[in-house]
Amino acid sequence: MSNKIIRSALEGHLKTWAAAQVPPLPVFLENRSKVPATGERHLRGDLIPAATLDPSQGAQHRRYHGMYQVGVFLPENEGTGDADDLAKAIEVLFKCPTVITKAGINVRIMQTPSIAQSRPDGAGFWMTPITIRYSADDFS
């Protein structure tokens, strides 16, 4: 249940920011039929949960942690400057120690997001991945 809440919290945080950009940046989410138009600048978010922990040994406390991977996709052959700027802005958006609350769950950003090497994605886009580590405790 909490992975669903965590995904919703992180996606909502990203989508709110992306909608406020000029022009707005579309965000494409996992397992959805919507796809970007040819050459359309966009973001993609993927939740990568790790093993759930039971710190209390009584099953009343579960700790969810993992990574939220955000990809910045810009048309190929337009340079790296815009991709670098967007990646840096997302790094700031999810800076440590950001806390995003959804349905009583506090999703904590555990460290500064990592911006990896950009590369072509094979579909006409230049992709810059940003890895955001999170943790959330569920006491329900």
Give the location of each predicted region:
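Acidic-leaning, charged glycine-interspersed low-complexity segments
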Residues: 21-22, 91-137
